Amino acid sequence: MKDVVTSPANLGKFQDPDVTADGQTRASVALSHPETLWFNTGTLCNIECANCYIFSSPSNDALVYITESEVRDYLSQITERGWPISEIGFTGGEPFMNPEIIGMTRAALEAGHEVLILTNAMRPMMRKSMRAGLLDLAQDWRDRITLRISVDHWSEALHDEERGKGAFALTIEGMQWLRDNGFAMTVAGRTVWGESEAQSRDGYRSLYAEHGFDIDADDPAATVLFPEMDETAEVPEITTACWDILGKSPSEPMCASSRMVVKRKGAEKPAVLACTLLPYSPEFELGETLAEAERDVKLNHPHCAKFCVLGGASCSG
């Protein structure tokens, strides 16, 4: 399984890790300030979205369930390497499909980290065992747990267009439970429908007001509007000269501040990846340990350019 199929518009690009198609030095990013370590809990999901970047579905187990013991090992490595990690993120798939998500979350909290869980807040989260687990964690660590809810669009019709009929209502039900039990929430939306950012934020603001959700529609970290990853679009390669031209710093892309741990189907051990967006590209797999994952990342993928450098996206909260 690949992350992207090279489109005709990008033929000849993103081939050599060191040099762009026109012979310039390709930009790279150092792990300058590790702040977030992500764990992919597995690619299994309770739904199959129309345009999921990681192809999560009820049948895709390309990334299998990571275990609590494996997570604890990486938490120990954080201490050993002296990484100043403030946040542990859990993503999927749907994290609440993984039967050990509560234990993994507890391990991260016990280690002193903030925890961010990306979820659709649907039936997996609303199972009795998961709700009980969240409430138990909240007794000691409520102020260090945030759930980022996938609300692709503020309207039911367009959200369900992406996620299936009835998905919006189930997500709102889950958010209402989180609201009623005092959990901090943020929202991840999308920009595929051609609205301006102001229009999108106005729509989310109305949604939050309707349901009494304490979420700031104007804060880009609280209502995250992700740019679309159009695999057919032509994108420029990022050279070392681009930083000054664009007025950006190599400390800004996600790979300057985060890594993601995954466990591939059939693999004996988990692996550490440079980026949450490229789970299937071998060149972005850095090794099995955090020590191996400290090396620089060459921006040799269309997503690096369009989504991270030009789109300015970040997965952290």
At which residue positions do the language-model features occur?
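Accessory C-terminal segments flanking Radical SAM cores
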Residues: 209, 227-317
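Broad gene-expression machinery/nucleic-acid interaction feature
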Residues: 36, 146, 257
